[in-house]
């Protein structure tokens, strides 16, 4: 029988701490300890990439670089790169949310001090090795960010210098010379990110916790990939996207979803054996133990929308690379532990692709109660073994928020299905139903374990502002939360056998 396992979805940004956002510091190590005490196997996070306008981790300036907001200042103080006085500033009054505008203003000058101190000590062998090993993506990223900053953070298509827009060698050499200090800043901060992340990951792995990372299928239009490798995308002669990604209209979104990400030129990628994808996945597995690939159905067929469209209604389905891509990646990298995010519109081709790869798909418990239909494949009694079951994802409301907004008929069906008594919190009842399913792996969102309502929702798709800001406080992670999670983990045979400890 396959081993049954469980974990918790909690993004780094949502960890408690004194610097306005969760980091790779003490709170992250404490969270690993919480997972150990509750006998979990996995810690799932959202993408670790650099965030841009809108603060979404799914819209990054790079498919490879890390988000320097997660660099922990206390660790830099311990390393002698900062002083307590350097970080003594107002990081905001509300510890339950992230103020990205404040972070943008406050963190850069502090990180510049740390970089100066790092360089003053002399470049370490570890740093030199990192720069050499990661040069293929690190140098274009450092160039892109330094030049972008010199143009007031405008996307590369809006840069006033045509020569550097097209990355002409002479122009690039001039900018590299003029912005040498800025390039070094981005190299060093990526190194500090990498060092701190791998120290945290080692601690997790040493304590038998595996990290599930998240890889967006697409890159952003405002990204180093679009600037440095435009031949991998469907673009016009100026490098602008000819078409963009999204989702067709459905009952929840009558105009569809217009994401705006450029569409890949799959023919060009196929011609070089999908090496860009192999390198991207290899980089992901250097960071994570398991990788969830977002919008898996886009590899079978994707919704292509003209770049000039105002919404997603006039798009069309276009065939993706299919199994060819995963066959090529497997030949280059071997078997990979991947979770296929197969939510949304599914057809036979997507299902066949997922089954051909052998990747587990996803099940979302909230979806099962919509329509009050016992035949719904999203109810636990219909879950397959080879699936990862969630109460919800970052795009869903918390289960308490969902329950509050559901119809009376849906709530009644939900309560009857779960055999819930009035005294049992709905969040706990739904988690109990989830953990009792036959799916080999279940993942609880942290907000649901804390019984939080819609105010703790991570993201509302197709909206701007107020997303990606939720943070947990230290006080919220109580002994009763631990006792509940440990209880259902043991009751439904999901306890990590490596963790024989009592809740403290």
Description of each model-found segment:
Residues 26-51, 287-288:
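Catalytic domains of carbohydrate-active enzymes, especially glycoside hydrolases
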Residues 186-219:
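Conserved, well-ordered alpha-helix/loop/beta-strand core segments that scaffold catalytic motifs
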Residues 2, 11, 55-190, 219-443, ...:
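Alpha-amylase-like alpha-glycosidases and glucanotransferases acting on alpha-linked glucans and related
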Residues 1-13, 29:
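N-terminal regions that are enriched for targeting/export leaders
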Residues 26-33, 195-203, 277-279, 426-430:
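Short alpha-helical segments and helix-capping/turn motifs at coil-helix boundaries
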Residues 451-503:
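Structured C-terminal cap/extension of enzyme domains
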Residues 36, 197-205, 330, 354-355:
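Surface-exposed amphipathic alpha-helices with a cationic face
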